[in-house]
Curated annotation (Swiss-Prot):
Its EC number is 4.1.99.17. GO terms for cellular component: cytosol. This is Phosphomethylpyrimidine synthase. Zn(2+) binds at residues 280, 344. Pfam families: ThiC_Rad_SAM (PF01964). Keywords: 4Fe-4S, Iron, Iron-sulfur, Lyase, Metal-binding, S-adenosyl-L-methionine, Thiamine biosynthesis, Zinc. InterPro entries: ThiC, ThiC/Bza_core_dom, ThiC/BzaA/B. Substrate binds at residues 81, 110, 140, 176, 196-198, 237-240, 276, 303. The lineage of its organism: Bacteria, Bacillati, Cyanobacteriota, Cyanophyceae, Acaryochloridales. [4Fe-4S] cluster binds at residues 424, 427, 432. Belongs to the ThiC family. The gene is thiC.
């Protein structure tokens, strides 16, 4: 593992974060690696990390990680959620989902396990098997440690689980520190109230104890843990809207302001931060949400779940949300959290993971093209040339999901001879417009004719 050599000299230091080194003017091996992957200058990567506009989630205890970057200067990234639940799934199924997610292009993976076995064993196995950054929501295991009795949780319970995740090699954690007790009454006019699982746990704790959010009051302690291992904050949006009616409301925006304050507090200690966002947002409010986050959070990378642009399509929410995700990415969101067809209905299986990921790779790629990122359209142009030349195998190779493209083609024309045919089953051999090859010689003749007889052509029209 090459990265083992990179991090060996850092272990034991008080602060080993990428931001800490970047602010000292040091371009780490991870920054060089990211620069090569993004086709960007290493100094630009260092500068973006130093100012907090880019993060490289890279726990020093995750040596088999292939470093990647999340930030507006980099390509738009996609996260896939996996995780066992008490009612469904197990370790082997989750490892299979991890492999599938990586195969279909997940840039990071979050383990959201809430049951289904030994959570520490599941998490450790996922980290050891993963070349991509792993994120977690430690509040889930904190609740499991007290057998679901929210009121029994103490601040030390939260901190213990957070440190354990950091020691195990988790690269970023969702920390719901922006949900303050005074914000809870703001949800009373919502249709769906609080839809964040972590936020719901903390809300119950505050309602029972009538005390401030322990993740907020102990935020400095969490910073100290993150400094030691280079864990990045993914500041959770506990008050994200769970339906269009609740989008961009007072509760959501109040929490966002606090998330901005927490971002800057973490930066004071050179700890990396990204900020999570909605959710369910009408199309005409997506740009406002992205701009507002950049303003409140000093341009820390934005990481959104969707957003879904309509609430009436259960079973198709990978589509309703990919529409919003493409727009959010275009406006400057750095990472998109995928939504599967099972959203709101049940735990996704392997095929759901595949469908959700491909939908989001499409959204992220469309955003990269719209933002004119270097080389973003190269693959599109190459596939278009292959399509025009009826190079079917090359088209399949360049597709986001080569197996699905080949499968659909071969449903009607399975024989190998059709891989060189100048048609597909849509138009057949006589009606395919791409057979109309206008060569350079014919065009040159036409241009001469048009130049000579332009008036005559215009008159006849």
């Amino acid at each position: 593992m090459v990265r083992s050599e990179w991090i060996a000299a850092r272990k034991g230091h008080d602060n080993v974060t990428q931001m800490h080194y970047a602010r000292q003017g040091i371009i780490t091996e991870e920054m060089h690696y990211v620069a090569q992957r993004e086709n960007l200058p290493p100094e630009l990567i260092r500068d973006e990390v130093a100012r907090g506009r880019m993060i490289i989630p890279a726990n020093i205890n995750h040596p088999n990680l292939e470093p990647m970057a999340i930030g507006i200067a980099a390509k738009c990234k996609v996260n896939a959620n996996i995780g066992a639940s008490p009612n469904s799934s197990n370790l082997e199924e989750e490892l299979a989902k991890l492999r599938l997610a990586v195969k279909y292009g997940a840039d990071t993976v979050m383990d959201l396990s809430t049951g289904g076995g030994d959570l520490d064993a599941i998490r450790t196995a996922i980290i050891n098997a993963s070349p991509v950054p792993i994120g977690t929501v430690p509040v889930y295991q904190a609740l499991e440690s007290v057998h679901g009795s929210v009121e029994r949780l103490t601040p030390d319970d939260f901190l213990h689980v957070i440190e354990k995740h950091a020691q195990q090699g988790v690269d970023y954690m969702t920390i719901h520190a922006g949900l303050l007790i005074e914000y809870l009454p703001l949800v009373k006019n919502r249709i769906t109230g609080i839809v964040s699982r972590g936020g719901g746990i903390l809300a119950k704790w505050m309602l029972y104890h009538h005390k401030q959010n322990p993740l907020y009051t102990h935020f400095r302690d969490i910073i100290e843990i993150f400094k030691k291992y280079d864990v990045s904050f993914s500041l959770g949006d506990s008050l994200r809207p769970g339906c269009l009616h609740d989008a961009s409301d007072e509760a959501q925006l109040a929490e966002l302001k606090t998330l901005g304050q927490l971002t800057r507090k973490a930066w004071e200690h050179d700890v990396q931060v990204m900020v999570e966002g909605p959710g369910h947002v009408p199309m005409d409010q997506i740009e406002f949400n992205v701009r507002k986050q950049m303003e409140e959070c000093s341009e820390a990378p934005f990481y959104v779940l969707g957003p879904l642009v309509t609430d009436i399509a259960p079973g198709y929410d990978h589509i309703t949300s990919a529409i919003g995700a493409a727009l959010a990415g275009w406006y400057g969101t750095a990472m998109l959290c995928y939504v599967t067809p099972k959203e709101h209905l049940g735990l996704p299986n392997a095929e759901d993971v595949r469908n959700g990921l491909i939908a989001y790779k499409i959204a992220a790629h469309a955003a990269d093209i719209a933002r004119h990122r270097p080389g973003a359209r190269d693959r599109d142009d190459e596939l278009s040339r292959a399509r025009y030349n009826f190079d079917w195998n090359r088209q399949f190779e360049l597709a986001l999901d080569p197996e699905r493209a080949r499968e659909y083609h071969d449903e009607t024309l399975p024989a190998d001879i059709y891989k060189t045919a100048e048609f597909c089953s849509m138009c057949g051999p006589k009606f395919c417009p791409m057979q109309t090859k206008v060569d350079a010689e014919a065009l040159a003749e036409l241009e001469k004719f048009l130049a000579k007889d332009k008036d005559q052509v215009s008159a006849s029209a």
